Swiss-Prot record:
Residues 1-10, 145-165, 379-393 have a biased composition (Basic and acidic residues). A motif (NAP1L motif) lies at residues 126-151. The lineage of its organism: Eukaryota, Metazoa, Chordata, Craniata, Vertebrata. This is Nucleosome assembly protein 1-like 1. One of its GO terms (molecular function) is histone binding. Phosphorylated by cyclin B-cdc2 kinase complexes. Transmembrane segments: none annotated. Residues 1-36, 132-165, 347-393 are annotated as: Disordered. Pfam families: NAP. It comes from the Eukaryota.
Length: 393
């Protein structure tokens, strides 16, 4: 009887040990998963790790997968045929963008009379009629009759106290200061010059000429330079690269050319003079020397880095040109056609609304993920997370 009890006790002890081992294994597995999640979260918050991961993913773009390599030769031949069709699609797409450029050139001529009248109003060479000044206010912007009359009286009183302004003073400077992309370029010493900016125009290349556009900055006579117009020309290309035709995604800016600014004496804001004290090693005497060095200024925009014939640029020059191309495109596509809305800030509010909507969508998605984690006891983030995606621009 004692032997039986001992045997049963031994079996129970073995079962308990197995249960303990199972629990320890489960706990060890949970600890490993928790540590893995913590490590992943730390890595994703490290900019250097993210940059290295992005670079690795970029290197993988265009790399054939194992599946493609394993295909039979006859299937690979058919895939090659599809690639040849894709190249022809890229060539047709290039022609499409060339025709779009021609349409832009055609419609620019239709827009120009309106832009000229805009310039006349800004620069006080034309006074709009009462009818032209009427603007229907949105209901949200409208106010009660009493408040409206009071505001009108106060406005008239202020106008009487002030000197009668001509046109719309500092129109383009206000536009620049309202747009982050441009305000970052404008230094305090640039502002007195930009107050003399009368107009910005875009001119497209003539029919049959290589694709390009020129930004023209028109200035009234001023104390800083003799130029009436400062120009910046962007050369474009709309054709697939023979060495990498699948990278074609529309016209790209290949380079840009600025202009020489004829600065008046002592007025060049792109340069500054600094003084340094130098001590003679032997005699110990000190002398002061002056040196002219580059200075941050919006007007450096008209002196972009030159692209070498081999197309290779150092990192600094490449970063400057990339930002330059973005600014040139933004001026052409947004600022020039819609300048009054950037002057009033309405276009900026629209841009902010777009970003807010994206942010709300992202918040909603995060909320759904958190709900899944709370409601599902078996939820594991690593099973739901998608691998990082790399999109070619």
């Amino acid at each position: 009887m004692a032997n039986i009890d001992n045997k049963e006790q031994t079996e129970l002890d073995q079962q308990d040990m197995e249960d303990v081992e199972d629990i320890e294994e489960e706990e060890a597995g949970e600890d490993a998963n928790s540590k893995a999640r913590q490590l992943t979260a730390q890595m994703m918050q490290n900019p250097q790790v993210l940059a290295a991961l992005q670079e690795r993913l970029d290197d993988l773009v265009g790399t054939p997968t194992g599946y493609i390599e394993s295909l039979p030769k006859v299937v690979k031949r058919r895939v090659n045929a599809l690639k040849n069709l894709q190249v022809k699609c890229a060539q047709i797409e290039a022609k499409f963008y060339e025709e779009v450029h021609e349409l832009e050139r055609k419609y620019a001529a239709l827009y120009q009379p309106l832009f000229d009248k805009r310039s006349d109003i800004i620069n006080a060479t034309y006074e709009p009629t009462e009818e032209e000044c009427e603007w229907k206010v949105d209901e949200e912007e409208d106010i009660s009759g009493d408040l409206k009359d009071k505001a009108k009286l106060e406005e008239e009183k202020k106008d009487e106290e002030k000197e009668d302004p001509k046109g719309i003073p500092e129109f383009w400077l206000t536009v620049f200061k309202n747009v982050d992309l441009l305000s970052d370029m404008v230094q305090e010493h640039d502002e007195p010059i930009l107050k003399h900016l009368k107009d910005i125009k875009v001119k497209f290349s003539e029919a049959g000429q290589p694709m390009s556009f020129t930004l023209e900055f028109h200035f009234e006579p001023n104390d800083f330079f003799t130029n009436e117009v400062l120009t910046k020309t962007y050369k474009m290309r709309s054709e697939p690269d023979e060495s990498d035709p699948f990278s074609f995604d529309g016209p790209e800016i290949m380079g840009c050319t600025g202009c020489l600014i004829d600065w008046k004496k002592g007025k060049n804001v792109t340069l500054k003079t600094i003084k340094k004290k130098q001590k003679h090693k032997g005699r110990g005497t000190v002398r002061t020397v002056t040196k002219t060095v580059p200075n941050d200024s919006f007007f450096n925009f008209f002196s972009p880095p030159e692209v070498p014939e081999n197309g290779e640029l150092d990192d600094d020059a490449e970063a400057i040109l990339t930002a330059d191309f973005e600014i040139g495109h933004f001026l052409r596509e947004r600022i020039i056609p819609r300048s009054v809305l950037y002057f009033t800030g309405e276009a900026i509010e629209d841009d902010d609304d777009d970003y807010d909507e994206e942010g709300e969508e992202a918040d909603d998605e995060e909320g759904e993920e958190e709900a899944d984690e709370d409601n599902d006891p078996d939820y594991e983030p690593k099973k739901d997370q998608n691998p990082a995606e790399c999109k070619q621009q």
